[in-house]
C-alpha cells in the first residue's frame, strides 16, 4: 500500500510537470525562441523529469527501506523545478479571461514564480540555521534553590534526513555554550532506524549539563514506519536505540521519573513514552511514570506530543511545566503563524493555564522536504523563576 501511494504520487507529479512544461513552452519559449528553442527546452526538461522519475521509482521499488533520503531529494527537485512553473501557470491563465487576451497576469505570474523559487532556495538555507530562544517560566511552587534554573530544550533531530555532521556539531556547540543546568530532548532522534545514530554518536555524546541530559522517545523512534522481518527485529532496533542513548550519557525516561536535588530542595523530572493519537501507537503512561501526580513537588514533564498536555496533563495533574516537540511548525512559519495550528492548537512556543505551562519546541530536523520556510531550527533556554 505504501509503495502504491508513492508510485501514484510520482505519476501525479509527472502529469503536473508535463502540463506545466507544455504551457510554458507555448506561452513563453516558442514565441520568443521559435520552434528550435521550444524543442530544446522540452528535451532538457524531459530529461530532468525522466531522471527524477527513474530515481524516485527505483527508490520506491526498493521497498523504501533505505530510500527515504533519496525520495526526499527527488521531491525537492520537483519542487525547485516545477512549483515556480505551476505558480506561473495558475496566475497567467487569468489573462485568458479577457478578450483580447491580456498580458498583465503573465507578468505577475513571472514575479510569483521568481518569488516561489527564492522561497524554496531560502527555506533550504534556513534549515541549517539555529534560532536560540529564551523564555522565563514563573511559578509560586518553585523551590528557592532552583531560582534561575536553566533548562536547554531541543527536539526532533530526525538524523536520517539531517545530512550534515557539521550542522550537528554546530547544534551541540550552541547548546553547550548556553550554560545549561539540565538538557531536555523531547523525542524523534531518528527517522526510522537506530543505525541513523551511528554517524552522529560521537557528536551528540559531547553534550554537557550540570545535572544531566534527559530524553524521551518520539513516534519516529519506535521503528513503526519500517516493515520489519519480525517483531524481534523491531524490538532489537528499539533496544539498540536505548543502549546508544545510555552510552552517550543521556538518561532516557520511558514512563519513568527521577529527582534533582539542590541543598534541601528537589524537583521531579518525568518522562513518558510517545503519547499519540492514531495512527501513532499509544505508548505513554503518565501514571506509571509518576503515580503521585498531585503531590507538592515541582514537576517537569517531557512528552513528545503537545496534545498530551490538554488531553491528560491538565485534567489529571498539577505538573508545572511540560516540554514537547513533534509539530516542526509544519516546517512553515510566517509572521508567527503556522498552518499546523489547524491540527495542533499548541504548535510552537510557550502556553499556559494558570501556573501550568507547556513549551513546544519546533525542532531541529526535517521530514518530507529538506526545507524550513520560516520555522527556523530551534534551541530553547527555559529559565525557572519564582512568582
Region locations from a protein language model:
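Non-catalytic terminal accessory segments
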Residues: 1-128
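N-terminal active-site segment of His-dependent metallophosphoesterases
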Residues: 7-25, 30, 41, 67, ...
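A structural signal for well-ordered alpha-helical scaffolds and beta->alpha junctions
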Residues: 21, 74, 87, 130, ...
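Generic structural motif
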Residues: 86, 93, 100, 140-142, ...
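Contiguous N-terminal and early-domain "leader" segments and peripheral loops that mark the onset or edge
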Residues: 105, 117-129, 134, 239-247, ...
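Soluble catalytic domains of enzymes that build or remodel membrane lipids, polysaccharides, and related
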Residues: 144-387
Amino acid at each position: 500500500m505504501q509503495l502504491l501511494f508513492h508510485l501514484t504520487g510520482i505519476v501525479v507529479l509527472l502529469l503536473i510537470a508535463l502540463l506545466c512544461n507544455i504551457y510554458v513552452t507555448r506561452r513563453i519559449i516558442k514565441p520568443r525562441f521559435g520552434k528550435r528553442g521550444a524543442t530544446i527546452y522540452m528535451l532538457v526538461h524531459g530529461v530532468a523529469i525522466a531522471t527524477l522519475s527513474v530515481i524516485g521509482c527505483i527508490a520506491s521499488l526498493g521497498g523504501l527501506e533505505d530510500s527515504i533520503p533519496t525520495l526526499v531529494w527527488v521531491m525537492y527537485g520537483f519542487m525547485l523545478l516545477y512549483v515556480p512553473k505551476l505558480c506561473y501557470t495558475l496566475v497567467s491563465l487569468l489573462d485568458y479571461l479577457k478578450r483580447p487576451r491580456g498580458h498583465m497576469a503573465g507578468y505577475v505570474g513571472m514575479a510569483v514564480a521568481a518569488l516561489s523559487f527564492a522561497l524554496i532556495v531560502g527555506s533550504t538555507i534556513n534549515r541549517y540555521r539555529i534560532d536560540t530562544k529564551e523564555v522565563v517560566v514563573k511559578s509560586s511552587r518553585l523551590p528557592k534553590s532552583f531560582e534561575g534554573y536553566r533548562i536547554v530544550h531541543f527536539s526532533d533531530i530526525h538524523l536520517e534526513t539531517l545530512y550534515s555532521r557539521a550542522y550537528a556539531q554546530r547544534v551541540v556547540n550552541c547548546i553547550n555554550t548556553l550554560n545549561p543546568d539540565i538538557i531536555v530532548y523531547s523525542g524523534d532522534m531518528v527517522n526510522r532506524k537506530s543505525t541513523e545514530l551511528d554517524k552522529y554518536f560521537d557528536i551528540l555524546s559531547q553534550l554537557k549539563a550540570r545535572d544531566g541530559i534527559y530524553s524521551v522517545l518520539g513516534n519516529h523512534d519506535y521503528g513503526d514506519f519500517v516493515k520489519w522481518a519480525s517483531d524481534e527485529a523491531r524490538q532489537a532496533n528499539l533496544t539498540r536505540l536505548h543502549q546508544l542513548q545510555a552510552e552517550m550519557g543521556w538518561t532516557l525516561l520511558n514512563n519513568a521519573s527521577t529527582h534533582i536535588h539542590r541543598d534541601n530542595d528537589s524537583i521531579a523530572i518525568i518522562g513518558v513514552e510517545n503519547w499519540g493519537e492514531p495512527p501513532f501507537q499509544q505508548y505513554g503512561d503518565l501514571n506509571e511514570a509518576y503515580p503521585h501526580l498531585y503531590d507538592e513537588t515541582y514537576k517537569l514533564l517531557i512528552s513528545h506530543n503537545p496534545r498530551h498536555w490538554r488531553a491528560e496533563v491538565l485534567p489529571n495533574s498539577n505538573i508545572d511545566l511540560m516540554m514537547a516537540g513533534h509539530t516542526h511548525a509544519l516546517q512553515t512559519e510566517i509572521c508567527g503563524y503556522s498552518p499546523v495550528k489547524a491540527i495542533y492548537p499548541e504548535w510552537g512556543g510557550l502556553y499556559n493555564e494558570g501556573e501550568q505551562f507547556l513549551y513546544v519546541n519546533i525542532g531541529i530536523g526535517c521530514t518530507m522536504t529538506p526545507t524550513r520556510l520560516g520555522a527556523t531550527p530551534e534551541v530553547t533556554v527555559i529559565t525557572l523563576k519564582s512568582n
